[in-house]
Amino acid sequence: MIPVSRFFTVQDPSNALLSYTQKGIDFFEKLGQFSKEKAAIEEEYSTKLRSLAKKYAKKSEEDDEILKSVSYTSSFNSFLQQLDQIATRHQTSAEHIRGGVVSYVASKTCQMRSSRKNAINDLKTINDKLEDQINEMCKSGKCYLKSFKDAENSYQKFYKADKNLEISRLELEKARALANARNEACELAKQDYSALVRKTNAEQKRYHVELLPVIFARLKAVDKECIADMRQVLQKIVSFDDSLADSTEECRKIMQREVGKIDAEGDAQLVLKSVEATIEQPAPFEIEDLGDPKNCDSRTNDSADGSGGKLLKSSPSKNRIIRNFLGILKEKEADEKPEASNNDQLMYTDKSKPAHVRLSCLRSKIRDMEKQLEQAIQGREGITRLQQAYYTNPQHGNPSACTEPLISYAKKIEKLKMDIHNLKEFYAMLEMSVEEGQERSFGGRDTPDTTRSMSGSSTNQSSSKTIEDVLSGEAGNSSSADDSSKNILRQLFTTPKRLISSPKTSKSSTPTPLRRRAEISSPKILRSSFSGAIRKSLSTPDSVKVETAVTVTALFEFAKSSAETMSIEQGEILLVLEHDHGDGWTRTKNCRKHNEESGFVPTSYLQFPQ
């Protein structure tokens, strides 16, 4: 008989092949996990690198104009920009790996697992079919073996009965007939077994020659595809790294070029010139003539008699000489404070000084005033808390004692806010004029400029002054820091609109209002505050008509001061013709039947409907 164990010898190579294919797919999936973690590392590195560049870019933003002008600051800013570009390249590489490798590995892994599973199912099917055929053959062999043994026993009994003379002839014939019948049954079982053996052999041959090689070929294709995908994935990762290296190499070349632009001699010379520009020329030392030493007796007698003799001046100390040389005045002496204020004012009004020095001095003045404002606000809050504590516990103190300090703080805060606001507006104008190449001139008219100006009024009536002329004239007349700031800005901010004439529009001598500055050239930048925040000035029509009639009530009396203004009385009903554009003036028309008049009035004098 054919041993059944011969079939199961095929299972060992099949299991080994299936195990190897599974390990290949697992390894391919591990490459996908590796790519995913590599992309995460690239993304994390990009985030940290971008945060680093952003952090030091903020630290490099200095308020000092000198540091903004030196080459190493601009080079370092360019260096940080390229560093941010490198971070962007790493971010892009991570996105490419995540989109081109990780997703590809995931889809191919599912596809190969499905192909392997189908091959395993087909292999199991042909194995089961061959196993059933072998089991049927074995069952037929058992039947043939049983029939053979039965026939053999029948013939042994027949031969034994034939030798026994005591057995009748009838019993002998029965034994012979039984043996022959058993022999025929054995022959039939043998034929069935032989047929099943031939069929099983044919099926086994077909299994090993036709079916099994096909399954192995399919598993081989899966394994081959898996290995090819491994190579493709690794090549993609290398190509992404090569692209990243090329792009970062370009950024590093730009970094080297920007670093090479650092000029040590030029930066040092620029700083030196800026510092020298801030040094005031000190007054020359005067020779103190003490007189003739021979007249010492007369000077002694004069002093003894009480007559007014000449007092010997003490020689200046070393510190005072150094301060005099550097142009630094004592701030501790009360009589020298106005002079120091005038010197600071002349610092940013002197046209011969560099622009960044003038802006820096003005910025320092505004910063000092903001510190004073903050201290005043904190003092008022402290007095308010103290007064509240007195109200809560009257035994601790009298709450009315805090009223006078609160009023004083309120006046001081209001005054500081007004001065800071005026200086900030002046700073914005000065900075804008410096950026455009030369300082714009502004008019001193008392009425707003409008395209609907009344007949007979001329926009050329006001005389234009430069910023330096106004500031220099006010600097000579001011006596203190606060009065100086008021006098400086008196001509700047008492008119409804500041009139600015652009150097690019030399064809017309008519000043242009600030709110229609955008018509000079496009685009223009309107600096709205000292903080440096800018907004683009949108082009608007020269005059905005009021679509619906708006009536307002005059709160106070106002006297006409120029051709474009009008007089109003308290409680008078007015009709609004043009709204306030931010300059503090509104064009209105009275409702008088016999004396109809229109013109500009202060917006704060009007009460608008709710």
UniProtKB/Swiss-Prot annotation:
Disulfide bonds: none annotated. Changing residue 585 to K: Abolishes binding to wve-1 and rescues the endosomal cargo sorting defect in the double toca-1 and toca-2 mutant. Its main location: other. It comes from the Eukaryota. Residues 453-464, 501-513 have a biased composition (Low complexity). InterPro entries: AH/BAR_dom_sf (IPR027267), F_BAR (IPR031160), FCH_dom (IPR001060), HR1_rho-bd (IPR011072), SH3-like_dom_sf (IPR036028), SH3_domain (IPR001452). PROSITE patterns: F_BAR, REM_1, SH3. Residues 352-429 form the REM-1 domain. Disruption phenotype: Double knockout with toca-1 results in nearly 100% of mutants with defective endocytosis by oocytes characterized by either reduced or non-detectable yolk protein in the oocytes and by an accumulation of aggregated yolk protein in the pseudocoelomatic space. Double knockout mutants with toca-1 also produce 20% fewer eggs compared to wild-type animals and there is some embryonic lethality whereby the dying embryos display defective morphogenesis including failed epidermal enclosure with extruding gut cells and increased width of the intestinal lumen. GO terms for cellular component: cell-cell junction; cytoplasm; intracellular vesicle; plasma membrane; recycling endosome. Keywords: Cell junction, Cell membrane, Coiled coil, Cytoplasm, Cytoplasmic vesicle, Endocytosis, Endosome, Membrane, SH3 domain. The keyword Coiled coil applies. Residues 475-487 have a biased composition (Polar residues). SUPFAM superfamilies: BAR/IMD domain-like (SSF103657), SH3-domain (SSF50044). GO terms for biological process: embryonic ectodermal digestive tract morphogenesis; endocytosis; negative regulation of protein localization to adherens junction; positive regulation of clathrin-dependent endocytosis; positive regulation of egg-laying behavior; regulation of actin cytoskeleton organization; signal transduction. Residues 283-315, 436-487, 499-519 are annotated as: Disordered. Gene3D superfamilies: 6.10.140.470, Arfaptin homology (AH) domain/BAR domain, SH3 Domains. PANTHER family: FCH AND DOUBLE SH3 DOMAINS PROTEIN, TRANSDUCER OF CDC42-DEPENDENT ACTIN ASSEMBLY PROTEIN 2 HOMOLOG. Plays a role in protein trafficking, actin organization and embryonic morphogenesis. Potentially acts as a cdc-42 effector. May play a role in egg laying. Together with toca-1, is required for protein trafficking regulating yolk protein clathrin-mediated endocytosis by oocytes during oogenesis and retrograde recycling and the sorting of recycling endosome cargo proteins such as mig-14. Also, together with toca-2, controls the distribution of actin at cell junctions. This is Transducer of Cdc42-dependent actin assembly protein 2 homolog. It comes from Caenorhabditis elegans. The gene is toca-2.
